[in-house]
């Protein structure tokens, strides 16, 4: 049985009648304080909110259907779940971004089991990647699809980590240029070279694919050098899309990011991943399913829904009661920003060296005439 303790001294209390409304009154024998102990259902309501968000259930099917349920869970939409700080280094992590609108992107980092961090930004850029990565210990290898600004952030925050570009995304990039059914011999061969990247198992096969790529450029040199004029009369390569496809693979080979997963010094006897499927299928797909099940939410609530999903898939999420105590809310964040702005205005208004009024410039303290003053 749960014992009620005094809010003042912490000692065990006894029952002391009831109020006019019928609420149980409690008395502390030590300090003689009397009080009521109302039941707080916030934790139970938060658990209901969590179950609804991560399921296919519609609001009508929840207890307190419709408006009552929305009214009960509205306060939980004000909470911002914060990512943990990961201090233990890991062998492999995956990074990717999921766009919720044109100007809302959430960057996510995970390993094989858990979500490690997330960050909201307008689009993928080096500064946003740096903020995400600074809270996570540097891994041995990072798998990425080549998001904008990630290589720059990787050099700054995790300079010793090796980068593995997702081979499936490399293939998709080539397919975007050649299409799935190319009509030219050069296009068919380039498509097959890119497709074979998904089946490389050792460095010997990797070297063979690189040789095929070099030989492809030599074999079709005359064909690729053909020029044409655009609508403005300027000369352009006739097979520009094929050249872009070849350059996309050549760039990855030159950067040594296409076959990092074959490096035995990083594997420790285990097979390293060559694709970003863990985060694409294991996280992004589930996030899109959740947003589709609860479609119609505002962009702010969609962002927080993704945050909640990521938080409850971290290594050690807090309990519901602890979350309600420690996580920041819209109101607390607004209060913090308001205090920071007021402090900045105050600091700007205080005169600095050389800006303040000097008393002696406006008053005479001796009997010399004013004409003697500078």
Which residues does each predicted region cover?
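Acidic/histidine-rich catalytic cores and adjacent linkers
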Residues: 25, 32, 37-42, 48, ...
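Short hydrophobic/aromatic residue motifs in ordered secondary structure
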Residues: 99, 148, 172, 283-284
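Short cysteine-rich clusters marking metal-coordination/redox-active sites
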Residues: 6-9, 28
